[in-house]
Amino acid sequence: MIQAMVKKLNGKRLRQRISSAILIVAILVSFSGILGGTAMLVMGIQYHYALTNYGFSQGDIGKMMITFADTRSNLRAAIGYQDKTLVQETYEAYETKKQACKDYAATVEETVASAEERKLYDQIMSGMEDYFTSADKVVQMGKDVTNIDQRNQAQRLAKDEVAPKYEAIYDNMVQLLDVNTSEGDK
């Protein structure tokens, strides 16, 4: 094919040969540019997918874990402090962290990419609903600094009922982070 083109070009005048050669080079360069642009587009899409579903999502899972741990800390403070002002401040912090945790959980859901991640995420979310229901009950019981018996009962409930739920959810969060990291390494 190339030999036939060369023979055809040799039979033409110099001006036509130069014009034909320039046209062939321009077509080859254009084709290469289109091919390179397409390859860059595909790589960009894959890179964006990897960053969104694995790179950034690991940070989002970490933020969800931190705010979840902060809810526990603020819960303990709200039922443990004796100063009414501190109890109110830690209760407000508890509510703020609880909402932030739910917001991060919604962000994490957008990046769930595998069946295993979905299973863990669903376990976390169902456990979190139960945890926050119990934790809210404990905080309401224990934030009245004048009722010592009720505060003691709230502290026992926090230890016996809320703490095991917290541990189970946090373990699932750690597993979700591990699975997400493993999937991202592939």
Residue ranges and their predicted role:
Residues 1-27, 154:
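Positive-inside N-terminal membrane-insertion signal
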Residues 3, 7, 41-59, 92, ...:
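Polar/charged heptad-repeat coiled-coil helices used as signal-transmission/dimerization stalks
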Residues 18-71, 84-87, 113-128, 186:
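Amphipathic alpha-helical segments and their boundaries
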Residues 62-66, 92-97, 127-128, 141-145:
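A short, ordered amphipathic alpha-helix with a cationic face
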Residues 67-70, 74, 168, 172:
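Generic recognition of well-ordered alpha-helical segments
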Residues 72-75, 89, 93, 97:
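Early exported N-terminus immediately downstream of N-terminal targeting peptides
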Residues 79-88, 106-185:
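Polar/charged, Q/E/K-enriched amphipathic alpha-helical segments with strong coiled-coil propensity
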